[in-house]
Regions:
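Active-site glycine-centered loops adjacent to acidic/histidine catalytic or metal-binding residues
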Residues: 9, 47-48, 78-79, 154, ...
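Surface-exposed cleft-lining segments at the edges of enzyme active sites
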Residues: 14-16, 49-50, 119-130, 158-163
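Short, well-ordered beta-to-alpha junction loops that form the rim of enzyme active sites
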Residues: 118, 152-157, 189-191, 256
Length: 259
């Protein structure tokens, strides 16, 4: 069995009424992970580690995540992690072992993990680009079709709400290379709320955040940080435990709020 935790959208460096102390809530999330009663095989942060891509913010998030009790910590960048330099500072801090602009794959416990970067060259939607599509195609060519595949990205790889940029314009091409596999799951951040959808052989799960909620799709003109009534913020924040038992096609997910 593979067991891991997804955390996302910590936005270290954010200040404002929606969450006056994003460092405290991210620290709370890390404490939750460290007190699950077991050691996860890895922890994945699905992007927007920082709010403004500053070296200090990357140092802080790296320092905090070094306290996670797990053998591996993986990350993918969000658009907030590549504000002014196409992700160079992010890759300096977290890019070890990655190729291209920060993508990579790894095998753990018989499961094939693919970490993608769809937050560079943003026009309206997330974008993978030709180099990364070629990487995915070659990466999975050697795998047998019963290999379980889990894909991590920041922006959803499905059209959750394109009007707000909640989708990836060339994701269909990437997913076409995964069509022959019996178990394909995509986990993303970016939208700061739980959402799931199944299309063909792929199940998509958007994760929550440790920073602040965003409105539901179409609720208002734009996805601006939402300020909740006093005492309600931590109910909207959380972590996600994921487990996979060999031979299954579906992952088991458990969402835990930061109460």
């Amino acid at each position: 069995t593979l067991r891991f935790v997804q955390i996302s959208d910590s936005h270290l460096g954010f200040t404002g009424a929606p969450n006056p102390d994003v460092t405290a809530t991210f620290g709370h999330a890390i404490d939750l992970v460290n007190n699950l009663g077991y050691t996860p095989d890895f922890v994945i942060h699905t992007g927007d580690l920082t709010h403004l891509s500053s070296p200090e913010q990357f140092d802080q998030v790296k320092q905090m995540m070094s306290g996670l009790k797990t053998p591996h910590v993986f990350t993918v960048p969000g658009e907030h992690d590549s504000i002014d330099d196409a992700g160079q500072k992010y890759r300096n801090a977290f890019g070890a072992g990655s190729v291209g602009d920060g993508w990579y794959s790894i095998d753990i416990a018989g499961v094939h993990l693919i970490a993608l970067v769809n937050t560079l060259n943003l026009h309206k939607l997330g974008h993978l680009g030709a180099d990364q599509l070629e990487f995915v195609k070659k990466d999975v060519a050697r795998l047998s079709s019963d290999t379980p595949i889990i894909v991590f990205s920041h922006i959803p790889l499905f059209a959750m709400y394109p009007q707000w940029g909640w989708g990836t314009d060339d994701a269909t091409q990437a997913l076409s290379y995964l069509r022959r596999f019996s178990s394909v799951t995509c986990l993303n951040g970016h939208v700061h709320q739980l959402f799931s959808k199944t299309e063909d052989n792929v199940t998509f799960y958007s994760g929550t955040t440790t920073a602040y909620p965003l409105p539901h799709p179409g609720d208002g003109p734009a996805p601006k940080p939402a300020t909740l009534p006093a005492g309600k913020l931590r109910d909207a924040l959380g972590i996600r435990e994921v487990s996979y038992a060999r031979g299954e096609t579906a992952l088991a997910l458990k969402e835990t709020a930061l109460q």
